[in-house]
UniProtKB/Swiss-Prot annotation:
Pfam families reported for this sequence: UPF0102
NCBIfam families in alphabetical order: PRK12497.1-5
Family per similarity comment: Belongs to the UPF0102 family.
Protein name: UPF0102 protein BQ09720
GO MF assignments: nucleic acid binding
PANTHER family for the chain: UPF0102 PROTEIN YRAN (PTHR34039:SF1)
Lineage of producing organism: Bacteria, Pseudomonadati, Pseudomonadota, Alphaproteobacteria, Hyphomicrobiales
Bilayer-spanning residue ranges: none
Amino acid sequence: MKKERRQKSFHRGVRAEKWAAWWLRFKWFHIAEIRFKTKCGEIDLIARRGNLVLIVEVKARSTLAEAMAAVSRMNERRIEAAADIWLARQKDRALLDVRFDLIAILPWRLPQHIPAFFTSDK
């Protein structure tokens, strides 16, 4: 039962990430990475448009408030650490503007994109 619930949650997350990636493509962003994993943490989506880089956390929840509350300070730190690793691999990193966004996937609604959902302490 627990394994089934975990698998269902995983697949719901994958579908949400695909929907969020589609939404960003619709806004003319290039999807640079999906599910970028490091030993420090994972980034759901990394998108680029010119020098703007979006580090995106995707949450599938019933309400926008639930999606926003699902991102803890610890999650933010892990995302920042993973973003540092990704950025270190970019040749043009000195030119990049980085933003940490949230995309909430809600039932029967278009994705809710929250730009600059949190800022880096660095």
